[in-house]
């Protein structure tokens, strides 16, 4: 069967839903094609035995005004939930326990996380010379400007927490452009941060509060609210997009189905593009689709009686130097309401990542053993105590890694969009990996079509 629509969005993850939602609000004729039998992409909320937990992203950051504006538009069907004030605390593992990551000068001086020499070294950061390598990795930049221990016990675990990546491979100007620009534009992290804080802000700018967020009841509520009024075709298998002779686009799926449209927006992972866009020359496709995605195993662990153990923080991160088998542990029940029964606790463990891709092949029993060992040794629960909930989720293509080849990928995307009018290549292969980035990108694309 053949249909005609103005715009087709490929993929019903957060980027695709955000894009289509804004287009629909403009009165545009838009339809989403999704391979899976459900919408939401990596976002999936579960409710089991009094626990509410996520199998994909746990939180986002209100990093753009578009995030706050989206929830305002969805008011009545989805409510923004800002994390508790205690979520500002981040814990870092060193030795045999967690230490709070300092957030002020006094804390930076007194913390046992950093060497004394580096504590003095940071005082000279505003006068340190700029780097000369435009593709300098995050880790090298941090060690050069702040010192080795700041790299090892602040930047390394931060990169593990955000990217599940290797800070010596992630290129700063692509992976952390705001950090890169502080040195590039102001010559210093400290001077740049002070200057940015003094810049005048509009009322709209202030909507980007940088606070951690979820949705009341879980992120699935956001997916449901976005998709409520949209035309979405799920189970769209063997999907292919081809340009037509008359300057339109043909989207075929399930063998006999076809939608012809004027514009098509792809929001799928880079690894799915070769099969989706067979008309793109191999050389150009290789420059886009070679993006590496770090694999992640996420383990949800819940206890109905926390026995008084309390972790009022966002989570605990583990520096690679400490050689633990987990990347970090998030504390969702410390951040948000009604994530566990009264008196209980909910934890989200992250295992694997770019530096331990082999962990994806470990059995459920091996993953369970790793998690329980951390449950007892790191969170200090009694050895005889077992969790009331333990769920394992495996994500082969979890988080894209913005390495030094990213510039070539971005240039290829731009060239292809110029070469093929009406084709928009979106998703997390560009413009950032966080939920805030995905919402921002969706709104930006919708306003540009």
Where do the model's predicted regions map?
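Dinucleotide-binding Rossmann-like beta1-alpha1 core, especially the glycine-rich loop
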Residues: 49-129
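N-terminal Rossmann-like FAD-binding beta1-loop-alpha1 element of flavoenzymes
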Residues: 5-32
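Glycine-rich FAD pyrophosphate-binding loop
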Residues: 24-48
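Conserved Rossmann-like nucleotide-cofactor binding loop
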Residues: 15, 38, 271
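Short, well-ordered coil/turn residues at beta-beta hairpins
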Residues: 63, 144-145, 267-268
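Active-site/ligand-binding neighborhood in enzyme catalytic cores
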Residues: 124-241
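Conserved flavin/dinucleotide-binding core of flavoenzymes
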Residues: 102-106, 311, 329-449
